[in-house]
From Swiss-Prot:
Residues that coordinate or bind D-galacturonate: H39, E78, R94, R154, R174, V175, Q176, Y197, N214, S218, E241
GO cellular component: outer membrane-bounded periplasmic space
Protein's name in the database: Solute-binding protein Bpro_3107
Assigned keywords, A-Z: Disulfide bond, Periplasm, Signal, Sugar transport, Transport
Classification via PANTHER family: DICARBOXYLATE-BINDING PERIPLASMIC PROTEIN (PTHR33376:SF2), PTHR33376
Gene3D superfamilies per UniProt: Bacterial extracellular solute-binding protein, family 7
GO MF, one annotated term: carbohydrate binding
InterPro entries referenced in this protein's UniProt entry, alphabetically: DctP_fam (IPR018389), TRAP_DctP (IPR004682), TRAP_DctP_sf (IPR038404)
SS bond partners: C104-C138
Physiological role: Solute-binding protein that binds D-galacturonate and D-glucuronate (in vitro). Probably part of a tripartite ATP-independent periplasmic (TRAP) transport system that mediates solute transport into the cytoplasm.
Organism: Polaromonas sp. (strain JS666 / ATCC BAA-500)
Amino acid sequence: MTNRTPRISAIRSAALAALLAGLGMGAAQATEFRSADTHNADDYPTVAAVKYMGELLEKKSGGKHKIKVFNKQALGSEKETIDQVKIGALDFTRVNVGPMNAICPLTQVPTMPFLFSSIAHMRKSLDGPVGDEILKSCESAGFIGLAFYDSGARSIYAKKPIRTVADAKGLKIRVQQSDLWVALVSAMGANATPMPYGEVYTGLKTGLIDAAENNIPSFDTAKHVEAVKVYSKTEHSMAPEILVMSKIIYDKLPKAEQDMIRAAAKESVAFERQKWDEQEAKSLANVKAAGAEIVEVDKKSFQAVMGPVYDKFMTTPDMKRLVKAVQDTK
């Protein structure tokens, strides 16, 4: 199990520092914003992208604003950093949309299984009005949705091949802490097991879980490939990452500085995508070199059981409209 005491201390220290800084924030005061990320690698695409955003923001603000990225779960799990951002104890966090599902319901739309036909389709959909509407919808929950980052296609990795949906039956598969993700994996006949990202490696090693589902770069950089060697390309979701800012912090800034932050975030998207494509190719080579087997699957068998997931979660007119808009995007 992960030793949580140092992390909790770090979270409390970060929260105190943020609150003290917020008390004295003035229009002319230089600010070093803090942003969280759970990935270990300092050059992981999302980590690098927020660092790049910080460089852009520093230039746009004439050195007034900077961003320091705390990755490796230094400020907590994705759920913990979301909680900090909501109360203004942390400025930014980069998380997968999964942990935002309950807080900002429209983020469930891009999480839905087999919604996107390709990475290009996902990018085009989220670059347009659909993505803008989903980001905007987070404001009522206390978050400024700034950008979507690529997270590739998520697939199942285990000690054995998962070639059809029947092969997943009964497996304990780690999922994100989201009701939608529990339902998605349960629809396969598996036992969905919510677990923080930082605990997956130990869970796989000890047999607490049989499998996990994620993209190739995470399979590689989180060293999950050391624990299990079979990556079955279910590609059941292309759920993106989302970069959010605390609305409490954002609302204290002048309009011109708010616009700088939004512009820097948007400009970082193309950078992240380039890094993502490079990392995905590199990670695929890495896991193959580590002895991983990449397995093609019968995707139709997985798609066939996902109807109830849509029925359960795509319940509002807005959700249904956005799903159709994605499906109609060419």
